Every structure is written in structure tokens, then in C-alpha cells.
Amino acid sequence: MPFLNDLLEQTRRDASSSAALNAENCHPRAIVETHQRSEDTLQSRFRFDVAAVMQVVRNEVLGQDEALQAIEDVLTVVRADILDPRRPLFTALFLGPTGVGKTEVVRALARALHGDADAYCRVDMNTLAQEHYAAALTGAPPGYAGAKEGRTLFDQALLDGSQGRPGIVLFDELEKASKEVSQALLNVFDNGLLRLASGEKSFNFRNTLVFMTSNLAADEIRQHRLGPLASLRRLLGLQAARRERLPGLVRRRLVKRFSAEFVNRIDSTVVFNAIEQEVGERIVELEVSRLNRRLAKHHCRLQLDAAVVGKLASEGHDLEFGARALKRFIRHELEVPLAEYLLGNRIPCRAEVTCMTVAGHLERGRIRFSLPT
């Protein structure tokens, strides 16, 4: 029966968590003996392939090698299951300009771990700009309507994740929430639990990867990589020295916006770079591959020549607005003309052909399409 299977699965998770807590109180010699009894196989609550997960993430998020390496390091430690079992698995703050892939990393992780890009709990912090909106996280206080129900924005099933794979929660655009809302997360960072204001229940984050995104210090990050003097600094070999100063600049901006105790509880602050023009062609190719997945239901696929890819990458690049601006340009210059072409031309049905290739090429500076003869 389904409910018995769910109960059994929950019992297994509770047993794994209890074992992790008990391991912390064991003598080191007992831990070594436990590992020896496992016949050189590390016993872990988690069963996922770090390399396979990162391959998916790297295919989806381009131009952020340093940030993705930091995430891979974290997943390696999580997979080994050697983290403090009384805290969330990991808390990270993603900083960078808009449109550089901060949220896309979380979606790619959810897809790689759980098979669904939406298999994570997302809290849009820009909707919690007023201090009384902290109730959306901690529930209504005792005596208020809905206190006993304990309704919040969290879903414990998403926080728990799936069997052998951690859950994911994203607090998006953290800087737009009121200070009271962000302070409500301190207990989550400390011991992995969020007790509701009513005291009726708690949400457990101890099996969860906690991510936050923010555009704070975006100007400093952009100037560091692509400012007017960036090329000169690279030429003179001064880029490394400026890179060393960047974490200090970012930290000062964080402390101005958030309390020191809040910043001090974040495990890692990951800086995302502005999207450089050299990455543009790879982003275009990624978007075309996604478009081809959507075109599969029409039994056709799109193939662009190098000139079209170069045109989209160069003319669609926008330093300030990142990949989103490029995607809008692709929508206007490629997807709209392609849709008009598909509606105005007969595409052979499945009985006539398995998959038809639509070729895209430049003609007098505009993208044109044609079917093979």
C-alpha cells in the first residue's frame, strides 16, 4: 500500500539521520572499525554520481568555471557524508550580476539529482519585503488565524529530497527581503531546523542544500572582470592582485546589508562572473539544442550555419543584462522567424519522414530557413 511504502521510506530516512547523529558521539576507534566492517566501501546516506551531476550542470551553465568548481567540491563532501548532521548539508550565497546563471545552477542541480528542474523548494524573497512577511517562513504566531495549520512557503518533501539524494531550497533575490525575514533563517543555518512561531511543528533542513542568490556587489564583480581597466590589468599582470581584493569588497557589501551574525553563518559565498562575449556562441548552441528538443514534437530539427551562430552571439551580447538579453535576442531574431516559416510551410508528417532538418543561413544580413531538396 502506498502509505505503508511512504512510512517505510520515512523510517529509513529517520534511521539514517539518527545513525549520523550517533556517529558524532562515537569514539574515533569505533568509527574506524565501522569503516573496516564495510569492506572498504564508504557507508553514506547519499547515492549519487558527483561527476554525472556536474556534467549536467556544466552543460547548462556556461562561463562560470570557478563557481561550478566550488559547487563540485561541496557535492563531493556531501556524497562522502562527513558533514555535521546537525546543520544543513551546505549553505551558499550566489553573488553576481543579473543573467549570469545563479538560479540556473540550482535548476540544473535539481534536474541532475532528481530528474526535474523544478524539484526544489523556491522562496521568492522579493515578495517578503515587509517585516511582517516573516510569517510566510515561520507561520502565524499563536492566536492568529492559521497558527495551528502551520502554513508556510516550505514543502518538507522537497526539503528531504529523494532516496539517496539531498533536497534543495533556494532563497531567490535575498537582498530584497526585509531584515526580519532574513534573520528568521539564522536557526536554519545553525541547527538545520526552523520551528514555527506557533510551536506546532518544525521544518527539517538537515538533508538539504540551501542556496541563496543576490545581486549585491554586482557592479564590483562586473568591473573586476570586464571594467574599462580590466584588459590593462591583465596585460600588466595585476588581475590576480585585484582578484584577491574582491572577496573583501564583497564581504563589506554583505555586512552593510545583512547582520554580521547572518553573514558569518553562510558556509560559502560564490561569485559569478559577468558573461563574456567569448561564451556567447556556446550559449547560442545551448539554446538551439533546447529549441530542438521542443521541435521534436513537430518531427523536425534546426541546424544553423556558423555565420548565424556568430551573428546571434555578437549582436545579442549585453554586458549589463547577461544571458537573458541574449535569449531575448534569440527569441526575436531566430524563434519568431522560424515560427513564421513553420506555419507558412508544410512540414512532412511522421509517416513521410522520421525527422526533417530545417537549415538556417544568412541572406542579406537576415536569417532565412530552407528545407532540403
Predicted features along the sequence, with ranges:
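Conserved C-terminal "switch" segment of AAA+ ATPases
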Residues: 39-47, 60-61, 117-118, 219-310
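Pre-Walker A (pre-P-loop) alpha-helix and adjacent loop at the N terminus of AAA/AAA+ ATPase modules
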Residues: 47-91, 335-345
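Conserved Walker
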Residues: 79-85, 89, 148, 152-161, ...
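Conserved AAA+/SF3 P-loop NTPase catalytic/coupling segment centered on the Walker-B
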Residues: 130-134, 138, 161-190, 203, ...
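AAA+/P-loop NTPase substrate/partner-engagement loops
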Residues: 112-143
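Walker A/P-loop
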Residues: 83-123
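Dynamic helix-loop-helix/coil hinge segments at AAA+ ATPase domain boundaries and subdomain interfaces
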Residues: 37-70, 128-131, 144, 274, ...
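C-terminal engagement/docking regions of AAA+ P-loop ATPases
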Residues: 2-24, 98-100, 104-107, 321-373
